[in-house]
């Protein structure tokens, strides 16, 4: 089973894929930035970076977890951007 979460932040597309047996993947603008392999039982974290032309970069952190269904939280520079609250 595959679950996909996505958000566009300041013109950059952030996508997280979660599968039961192939782990989790973080893509930023279509490029793979982090990956966890295998089956995660309770939670996982992924890390990435938004690279801006002017040189300032922003850190991405993804938290995945859940008992029955997978929930996803995406943070940019420690600010929650997905899901919107």
Regions found by a protein language model. Give the residues of each.
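Terminal leader/tail segments of proteins
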Residues: 1-85
């Amino acid at each position: 089973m595959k679950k996909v979460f996505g958000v566009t932040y300041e013109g950059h597309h952030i996508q997280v894929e979660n599968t039961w047996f192939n782990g989790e993947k973080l893509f930023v603008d279509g490029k793979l930035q982090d990956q966890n392999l295998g089956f995660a039982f309770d939670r996982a974290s992924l890390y990435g970076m938004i690279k801006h032309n002017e040189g300032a970069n922003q850190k991405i952190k993804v938290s995945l977890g859940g008992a029955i269904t997978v929930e996803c939280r995406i943070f940019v520079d420690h600010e929650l951007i997905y899901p919107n609250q």
